[in-house]
């Protein structure tokens, strides 16, 4: 449920990009939201079933999503909105900086925490001793 809530900023930017008809941006936000939901499910399944490989994939994808988010922030800062109004990310220039950076920082923190927790859970599973703990 938390993963669905954390995709909220993607859907907001998805709608804004669709309103401005910047289809590359629509694709970027749609793909990121769907990937986040899919791999959040992988992380949940991996932790429930104690699957080392699913937790590793979950962590790697979170790291990739973190890097992709950082790259997106860099790209939106490099966009020259005044000279190129047809740019794919020009709709972000009309928004306030706080309204863009606050959700992005939240999403980057979620990706970082997901990667760290996935790696910690995988480490615990790998070094788990067999035994009856009940």
Curated annotation (Swiss-Prot):
One GO CC term, this protein: membrane
Indicate whether Transmembrane helix appears among the record's keywords.
Answer: yes
Q: Which membrane topology describes this protein?
A: Multi-pass membrane protein
> Where does the record place it?
Membrane
Keyword annotations for this protein, in alphabetical order, are: Membrane, Transmembrane, Transmembrane helix
Which parts pass through the membrane? Answer: 26-46, 55-75, 101-121
Query: What is the top-level taxon of the source organism?
Result: Eukaryota
What protein does this entry describe? Uncharacterized transmembrane protein DDB_G0295689
Q: Which organism is it from?
A: Dictyostelium discoideum (Social amoeba)
Q: Taxonomically, what lineage is the organism?
A: Eukaryota, Amoebozoa, Evosea, Eumycetozoa, Dictyostelia
């Amino acid at each position: 449920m938390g993963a669905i809530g954390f995709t909220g900023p993607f859907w907001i930017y998805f709608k804004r990009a669709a309103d401005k008809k910047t289809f590359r941006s629509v694709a970027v936000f749609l793909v990121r939201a769907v990937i986040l939901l899919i791999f959040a499910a992988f992380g949940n399944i991996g932790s429930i079933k104690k699957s080392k490989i699913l937790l590793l994939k979950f962590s790697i994808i979170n790291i990739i999503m973190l890097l992709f988010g950082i790259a997106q922030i860099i790209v939106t800062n490099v966009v020259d909105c005044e000279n190129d109004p047809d740019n794919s990310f020009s709709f972000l220039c009309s928004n306030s900086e706080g309204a863009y950076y606050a959700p992005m920082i939240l999403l980057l923190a979620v990706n970082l925490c997901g990667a760290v927790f996935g790696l910690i859970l995988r480490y615990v599973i790998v070094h788990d001793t067999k035994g009856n703990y009940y």
